[in-house]
Amino acid sequence: MSAGSFSTEAAKFSFSPILNKTFGFLTNRDTRELLMKWSMNGRITAQAFRYDECFQPYQKNDFVWAFFQDPDVLSHLKIVSENSGQWVTLGTKVKKVDVQEILCSQLSMSLFDCLYSEGIVRESGHICKCLDEYLDDFTISDELRKVLLLDDCEKHDVFSQSDREQFLFLLFKHLCLGGAICQFEDTIGPYLETTKSIYKDLLSVQKDPETKQIRIISTVFKVSAYDENGMCYPSGRPHQQTFAYLIVDPLKRHVYVLYHCFGGGAF
């Protein structure tokens, strides 16, 4: 959505940062040590903002446009500087946004049971190794990374296309691939546990009063923003491991931002 297609709907949303909000996965020592090992520490963050009007998912373009136009967002939204590698705020005038709604309906980790049943992970939890292959910035040295990265992999279809579009799967994939100098795990446990921790940290659920079933009420968007020079958020350098998700809680009227910029993590 660009300035030329600005909607009056967007004007009604305003945002303010929730500065005292903490996220467990960023403060938990064990999780931080894993993020450091995966070369993501110091390049991944989560932030919280509140908004002041009722939000419906069909308003996603207007909502995200308003988010990136809000001066309180621009002065607080963190990015990793391409020049220094340090945290700075976005601060630039956004001319266009791209918004993709992400499927988010998984209530358990059963999505990953196929890793065991299809021989990608042994019963012990150890990830099966393979001969090294190389794809872009990634070394593929095990069956897990083959399934995640290679479309022509023999076992690619253990995850359906709809599985691969789920926020839970995307989180898992991001953690498995890590940053520029990622040290891969030999076992699947740390990836699954960290995925679950972040997922629960970011999403809100509610019990349906009629069916008594738990359902996710948060809406997830993958976003990017552009200034007069091109893409400026999450970075001016596109990479599949550089990402930003907005997670919207319609009851609390909170927006959580999950951000990562591919590179060498902090030690």
UniProtKB/Swiss-Prot annotation:
The keyword Cytoplasm applies. This is Cilia- and flagella-associated protein 300. It is found in: Cytoplasm; Cytoplasm, Cytoskeleton, Cilium axoneme. Belongs to the CFAP300 family. It comes from the Eukaryota. It comes from Xenopus tropicalis. Keywords: Cell projection, Cytoplasm, Cytoskeleton. Cilium- and flagellum-specific protein that plays a role in axonemal structure organization and motility. May play a role in outer and inner dynein arm assembly. Disulfide bonds: none annotated. It holds the Pfam family CFAP300. GO terms for cellular component: cytoplasm; cytoskeleton; motile cilium.
